Amino acid sequence: VQNRGFDSARAVMPTPALFHIAFYRFVRIGDAPRIAAVLRELTHDLLGSILVAHEGLNGMLAGEADALDRFEHALREDDRFDGAFKGIAFKRSACRTAPFQRIKVHVRAEVLPLGVDGVDAVGRPGIQLDPAQWRALLDADDVVVIDNRNSFEYRLGRFRGAVDPQVGNFRDLPAFVEVNVAGWKARGQRVAMYCTGGIRCEKTAAWMHDAFDLDVHQLEGGILRYLAETPDAHVDWQGECFVFDNRIALDAGLNETATTAADVYAGDADEAWRLQRAQRLADT
């Protein structure tokens, strides 16, 4: 078993029989505890986490292909969801390392706190670009491309030409936008942003539209979809994509790399807590 920098070895699958899925949707949920109870029932044979709130859900799960297929079908079709998740997109990748050790379904006030009150992203996907459209946008002269992730993620990998807002948490992003939005408008720049799976960008875009009357172009499905659907993604993607699970990082082909949590966080005092958490989760 390969030990990727921790005191105890991680669970490593002998074959790529384990898969990871990421999914989210902003949708009005009236009874979040009831929805969470149904999700707990549907994930009894899976590992990972799902957050449920009045604004929707956000999840990452791992398991065998058949179990994930059953969950995906149920989330889209189970009558107990009243069609709230019909057509929801899933981003799937094969695993070598087991991403999670347990299953958690929690009810929260928000599935993704931006740190700004009153942001409503339900039914407001904004301007979504598919991978081909995103590639064309990267070559445009009038676009500022913002990496809507934490700075340590940007350092590990990024799209060519992207700007690092230098934030340590999603809740820090509004301050970056507030400082720069007047300049973008004065220069006549279009604003585009990307994140790992798309959820950060969708919520940020809703806020920026309301606060600054600014329409934001987003990479639909995020980095994960781009890498999955673009055979030559390495032309645009530089480095590795950080993921918030025990795999740590993926290359442009969505393959796990040898990067460890210590490689990502070591030397950054502000991120020491993340390293400690990663080590703790890997040891459980």
Regions found by a protein language model. Name each.
Residues 6-9, 14-125, 149-191, 199-284:
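Rhodanese-like catalytic fold shared by cysteine-dependent sulfurtransferases
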Residues 145-147:
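Structural scaffold elements adjacent to functional motifs in cytosolic proteins
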Residues 194:
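Cofactor-cradling patches in redox/metallo enzymes
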Residues 119-140:
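Internal catalytic-core helix/loop-beta-alpha segment
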